[in-house]
Amino acid sequence: MQIIEITEPEQADFKQERQIAVGIDFGTTNSLIAIATNRKVKVIKSRDDKELIPTTIDFTNENFIIGNNKGLRSIKRLFGKTLKEILNTPALFSLIKDYLEANSSELKLNFANKQLRISEIAAEVFIYLKNQAEEQLKTNITKAVITVPAHFNDAARGEVMLAAKIAGFEVLRLIAEPTAAAYAYGLNKNQKGCYLVYDLGGGTFDVSILNIQEGIFQVIATNGDNMLGGDDIDVVITQYLCNKFDLPNSVDTLQLAKKAKETLTYKDSFNNDNISINKQTLEQLILPLVERTINIAKECLEQAGNPKIDGIILVGGATRTPLIKTELSKAFKVQHISKRFRQDEFKGEPAGRIKIREHRQVLQNSLVSNFMEYAVDILSDIDPDKAVVWGAALQAENLTAPHTNSLLIDVVPLSLGVELYGGIVEKIIMRNTPIPISVVKEFTTYADNQTGIQFHILQGEREMAVDCRSLARFELKGLPPMKAGNIRAEVTFAIDADGILSVSAYEKISNTSHTIEVKPNHGIDKTEIDIMLENAYKNAKIDYTTRLLQEAIIEAEALIFSIERAIAELTALLSESEISIINSLLDNIKEAAHARDRILINNSIKEFKSKIKKSMNTKLNIIINDLLKGKNINQTK
């Protein structure tokens, strides 16, 4: 889910002690924790003076070791996944295979002499960050704003929140990583337009199109590759060094490759003993990887409808590679680049908050930029490793400082709804609706003497339940037996500020109610979300036609049921010829419904209404017309 910021009216000043809250970027490769005071952000270092803490969890006996680059890696990839999904995804299975018991039936890992869930293991990273912050700040810290990928659904979000809660944090808010980066650049203040957030981390690549209008943030498209990152650049360089200089494929060679990559960000050549590599060679090696990211960014823009881009925000340490800016300049006709770091930026010595505008010649590339006929800025004056945690820290201060007059809310990434009779989806909360939100809708029964209503909660953009993702099912029981359509059940969909959905149903006559908190037992990654949206766009016409057909069939079935019941109750008012006419007309409707021909169904219903009006006696005509009024499909099984 994405973030929206709403500024509330000015309030009277009053004294209030500020609560300490931190921002946390729980990354796939590295994690950071920071605190903001008076809009100035400080990234908190570990005992060994590191700001970037490797997101690795190891153990000796029952003691956990965080950040030693050993043990379990990339645990973030596992959030919201089922054991089945992991077993069927080689890249995920490789992460846990050394910790998973053979023939295990649930997702628990043998870790520190215990059987632990993913959230329990991930909690150790949060505990480590919390301890470092408390040690540095010399105070207890219990509140945090935590960033998550824009594509994380409520299952993955819930697992992040659980891990943080186990660690002793009260999660003030989960915010989308691209929004945090934009907030770090101050784009929430009097900025309008669309920004492309290019996030190349160690293990993943994410790109988002962020629309900002008067302080309101909305992620309108996301794309990426969960298996592409700066680590892949290191691997390519390592392979080159091994082949060119006959080096072993070892950790030492990998470290040498990283050093070469970092040096070549500000020098034309790298030399070490008998090893040498120049900038041109490096760029030739990694160009295919960079081009992959550019193509993914183009696809994301197309998904968003090719809006005019006002700026590109760079996130992730791998974006320091000069070739990335060069290729972005070609693809997006960059006007100028804002830069903050000196040549020694890899040594952790930022050159202060000085923006040096470097005007660069626009390089045309018809293959990638023919749809981009305008100039944009590349924003890179904040350390790309820290941009996300900066935004989180600023949001944490915003939510706890006594002078704050802002409120952060999210938006729903995929529509939420309920299955109606006939398998049709009634969308209750639409995609990109700001939250928290509560929506009430009324539903009724379809059959006589129905004492229960089953509710099937769905997620997705398709028109039919079979094409959407099932979230949960529940039944409202104990309803009084009444004729179809007489029961009225109020159904409330409510999403809180952290994106957790609860659904409640209430029937007034029997005073019966039921509430369920929807926590899906599996998550959706960005690829699945993209596929769901793409399928919705691709099948929109077919889905609409299918829905219209199903609605016509339901209307036909409802009419047939009502008229046949009326005939049984009003036999004394009807002559044999009238009954024969009605049955003949109903047979036509039945045949049309059986043939699944929408036009034929609609024409048969029109013919029925027309002939009934002409041939029936006045009293019966009134009764039947009453039966035909007010029919709708808001009926559940």
UniProtKB/Swiss-Prot annotation:
Highest taxon in the source lineage: Bacteria
Q: Provide the function of this protein.
A: Chaperone involved in the maturation of iron-sulfur cluster-containing proteins. Has a low intrinsic ATPase activity which is markedly stimulated by HscB.
What family classification does the UniProt entry report for this protein? Belongs to the heat shock protein 70 family.
Keyword Nucleotide-binding in record: yes
Positions of the UniProt region annotated as Insert: 335-376
Spell out the Gene3D superfamilies in the cross-references.
1.20.1270.10, 3.30.420.40, Actin, Chain A, domain 4 (3.90.640.10), Substrate Binding Domain Of DNAk, Chain A, domain 1 (2.60.34.10)
- What PANTHER family is this protein classified in? HEAT SHOCK PROTEIN 70KDA
Keywords assigned by UniProt? ATP-binding, Nucleotide-binding, Stress response
Q: What is this protein called?
A: Chaperone protein HscA homolog
Question: What Gene Ontology molecular-function terms does this entry list?
Answer: ATP binding; ATP-dependent protein folding chaperone
Q: Which InterPro entries match?
A: ATPase_NBD (IPR043129), Heat_shock_70_CS (IPR018181), HSP70_C_sf (IPR029048), HSP70_peptide-bd_sf (IPR029047), Hsp_70_fam (IPR013126), RPE3 (IPR022437)
